[in-house]
């Protein structure tokens, strides 16, 4: 296995180089023993909309400002999973023997873009030909999924409200959360309607941020820490982009497939998971993840949320103790590694 150690999250209005440098230095400083960036063999950095700032070659641009000049670097683009896959690539580089110490991270600066450019860079992560050009946005996509779920199962919008309230509650303890405030059930329920049935409080914010983790191989990790965080497994899967191609829009088959593989590799089951950071770009996405990861049975995700079983110290599996994307924020390419440790 390969351990990861060190996490830096930044949600401040500053330049991209400054955001990455702060996150990277936070990660370097968090290593228990002396660590220097020249000890890094490779770097993988996730980003989605860097082209929106008319900048390319992201990884090289950022790493040269954090002491990694001359190192092999790569930008990873895989929509909102970009830095999650950067982490997976870093892990595989170590497992293959090509590197001993690797940094994986992500960055996104969305709030300098106009609303139109934001919508464009978000929209191109979906199906452009059949959805984006027809006017379907991601809030609209998830609203359709939510309405179908309510039609098929014993659930209402109130269950999504509970998820929003929970994540804001968890985010109160996260010093780098984008939206760090308590939200009552009534306020979340009566929020501005974005795409029926989803209100403002069902939607994550558009965030600026950077995050990174440092991975080291088994035979060198003792140089850096006596208490590493071990990566036991990593799995991935994909699905159809367009909703009309999916056999069901009330479950995420890619999540189910990846979870099954990851649990098998690690030798565990969903019942063994105490904490889970899941992708709640919209509250309905967390409800789906709760089911698809096996924390609740199919069709019972609403009940899981209703009974606060994902709330800290109240259920068997704490969901999004960081506040999730809803509270911590969603800087696209930086979200994956931001969820890791």
Predicted regions and their residues:
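Single conserved hydrophobic/aromatic residue that forms the stacking wall/gate
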Residues: 1-7, 11
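Short catalytic helix/loop segments, enriched in acidic residues and glycine
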Residues: 12-31, 62, 66
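N-terminal extracellular/periplasmic Venus flytrap/periplasmic-binding protein-like
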Residues: 19, 162-228, 232-238, 316-318
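Phosphate/pyrophosphate-binding loops at sites that engage ATP/ADP/AMP, CoA/4′-phosphopantetheine
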Residues: 25-41, 149-156, 223, 258-272
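Beta-strand segments within the central parallel beta-sheet cores of soluble alpha/beta enzyme folds
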Residues: 37-47, 72-78, 102-106, 158-165, ...
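Conserved catalytic cysteine-centered active-site region
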Residues: 49-101, 109-141, 179-205, 237-241, ...
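Active-site-proximal alpha-helical scaffold in enzymes
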Residues: 77-108, 139-173, 213-219, 328-341
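A glycine- and small/hydrophobic-rich beta-loop-beta segment
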Residues: 228-237, 243-307, 314
């Amino acid at each position: 296995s390969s351990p990861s150690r060190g996490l830096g999250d930044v949600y401040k209005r500053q330049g991209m180089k400054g955001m990455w440098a702060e996150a990277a230095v936070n990660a370097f400083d968090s290593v228990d023993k002396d660590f220097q960036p020249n000890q890094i063999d490779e770097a993988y950095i996730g980003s989605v909309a860097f082209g929106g700032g008319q900048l390319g070659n992201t990884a090289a641009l950022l790493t040269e400002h954090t002491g990694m000049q001359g190192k092999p670097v790569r930008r990873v683009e895989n929509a909102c999973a970009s830095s999650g896959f950067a982490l997976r690539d870093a892990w595989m580089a170590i497992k293959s023997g090509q590197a001993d110490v690797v940094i994986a991270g992500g960055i996104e600066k969305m709030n300098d873009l106009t609303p139109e450019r934001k919508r464009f860079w978000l929209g191109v992560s979906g199906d452009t030909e059949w959805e984006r050009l027809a006017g379907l946005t991601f809030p609209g996509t998830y609203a359709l999924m939510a309405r179908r779920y309510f039609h098929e199962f014993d659930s209402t919008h109130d269950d999504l409200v509970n998820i929003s309230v929970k994540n804001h509650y968890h985010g109160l303890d996260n010093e780098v959360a984008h939206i760090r405030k308590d939200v009552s059930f009534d306020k979340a329920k009566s929020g501005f309607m974005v795409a029926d049935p989803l209100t403002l409080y069902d939607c994550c914010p558009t965030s600026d941020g950077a995050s990174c983790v440092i991975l080291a191989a088994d035979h060198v990790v003792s140089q850096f820490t006596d208490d590493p965080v071990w990566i036991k497994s990593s799995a991935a899967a994909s699905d159809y982009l367009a909703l009309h191609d999916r056999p069901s829009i009330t479950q995420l088959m890619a999540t189910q497939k990846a979870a099954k593989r990851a649990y098998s590799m690690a030798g565990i089951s969903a019942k063994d998971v105490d904490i889970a950071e899941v992708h709640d770009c919209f509250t309905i996405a967390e409800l789906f993840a709760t089911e698809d990861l096996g924390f609740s049975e199919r069709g019972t995700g609403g009940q899981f949320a209703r009974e606060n079983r994902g709330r800290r110290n109240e259920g068997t599996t704490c969901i999004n103790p960081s506040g999730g994307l809803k509270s911590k924020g969603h800087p696209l390419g930086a979200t994956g590694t931001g969820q890791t440790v």
